Amino acid sequence: MASFHSHSPSPPAALSPDDAPQPRRPSRTSLHDAAAAAAPALSPESPGHELEDGADSSEFNADDVPVEVLVKHLLAAKQSLSSMTLVLRANDLATSARQMHQEFVILSAQTAFLRHGILQELHILHQLRRGMARAYDNGTRDFKHIIRTLDTADGRLEKIMQVLRKTTVENVFRQPGEEPKCLLDFVDPKIVEQVRDALKESIHELSAAKTSFDGDLLRFDTDLRTLTDAMAAAASLANPTTTTPDGYPPDQRSIPNLLSALSEGSHLMAEHLSSLTRHFDMCVTAVRTTEGGAALARRRAAEATSSDEDQAPVSISGVISAQESESGPSAFEPMDPLERQELLHVVMRDAAEVDDVVADIHNVLQQMEMDHASLHSLFSASRASHAATLTCFSMLEEVGARASSYVAAEAEFMQRWEDEKETIDENVSKMDELKKFYEGFLNAYGGLLLEVERRRAVEGKIDSIWRKAKEQVDKLVEADKREREHFRLEVGDYVPADLWGVVDRPLGRWAVVPLEDTREGSYEMEAHGEPENEGKVETAYERETEPSTPTPRKMPLNGPGSAGERPF
């Protein structure tokens, strides 16, 4: 059997024959150390009880113990039994701790299962978000590339249009009195504006699709961030904010230790109460075996109850009355002197430890209250974390319901993107075709200028040839004139007038005219004199209105079959 706690530095004697000598230890200060220390208890009365120290037993004299001292110890023992409420409280704490631990295990398992599932779903949602981000980034890169491509194509088109705008049409291609024009006046600018408007509309649609998808991504990010924060908050709730007496928050790993400490504390307090009960029984026996002890005990109990109102009432009448009724009318029962001496020796020795045992019960209960508070804090934190995790699960259901709309938004964004890209590619191709057409137009105009110059050169050569021919004809006409005059002088006096008519006919005049008259005058070659339009030879081609080259033909002004025709 164990003994009461004692603050005495020397070890006490054994309380029973079966007890081995044990040193007394200081009052218990922590339930966590209770498992390592033996629990003290009062020694029970035993008929064969042997004293721990023979010298002490021989020196002790039961007759020297006044009855007042025994009654005092009896009342103190009875008063110590009021700690039964503390023991009951300790039992309630231990029972509550076991119930909380059972519920804690269930809640922890459910929370861990829910949390694992939510984290897996959250990981899938993050993967979905990364896929949407890649689609958004690819679209953004394509958008920038499209803008650069459009700027380049529009810049090339605008450059060639500027060249057309700065290129003035030569006078030779304009009607008389017509205002100056540039090459851009010969093309339809509405086509370019239509292409540009179509491109602007496509860019606007791409921007709208990008903005709409960006809004969906922001809402998705908000959902993920809210769910992640809620999960972090739920995890943080599993760690209580309260602190233990040592200044540190309780840890879930300490729950087994707390349960063990509460169970050991409850068991230790029950042992203390059992020891106090045995000590009270021995005090009752000691008083009953002492002459006048029962009556004095009842009187002192009544006086103690009436004198101190703050103190709990002490009632021993039931115990003493029952013993007295069992023992008959006598107020005291004789007992073997040796047994009585041993009994009183144990009572006197244990009486000094009653206060220590009661104080130890209070200390143990105080520590149990703190341990129970720590365990309750962990349980409350676990319950709060479980409730928060359930809230996260509800949030996950809502996010999952909206996830389909986010996926649909991604598909819509990609479809709109592809459609508008196809439209933009078509319009860019149109811009390239317009650029090529305008370049061809500009090159054709340059070729047209070269063709005009070439034709001018050809007509100049033709003019030169006809001028030389005219000079030869003029020489022939002059020679013919002289020959005619010489012939007339030689034979004119001899030829009759009837025969002279054909010979006297003037030399025919010739002119070179184009099949299609593209000039204001023509070259006429007369046998008698200069050409009528000699001064207009150099300017005839400058008044050209058609780019075609005329095919000249030679025809007589007065040819055969004309009026006055006579054979030569």
Curated annotation (Swiss-Prot):
It is found in: Cytoplasm; Preautophagosomal structure membrane. Residues 522-546 have a biased composition (Basic and acidic residues). This is Autophagy-related protein 17. GO terms for cellular component: Atg1/ULK1 kinase complex; phagophore assembly site; phagophore assembly site membrane. It is a peripheral membrane protein. Keywords: Autophagy, Cytoplasm, Membrane. GO terms for molecular function: molecular adaptor activity; protein kinase activator activity. It comes from Neurospora crassa (strain ATCC 24698 / 74-OR23-1A / CBS 708.71 / DSM 1257 / FGSC 987). Autophagy-specific protein that functions in response to autophagy-inducing signals as a scaffold to recruit other ATG proteins to organize pre-autophagosomal structure (PAS) formation. Modulates the timing and magnitude of the autophagy response, such as the size of the sequestering vesicles. Plays particularly a role in pexophagy and nucleophagy. One of its GO terms (biological process) is autophagosome assembly. Belongs to the ATG17 family. Residues 1-59, 522-568 are annotated as: Disordered.
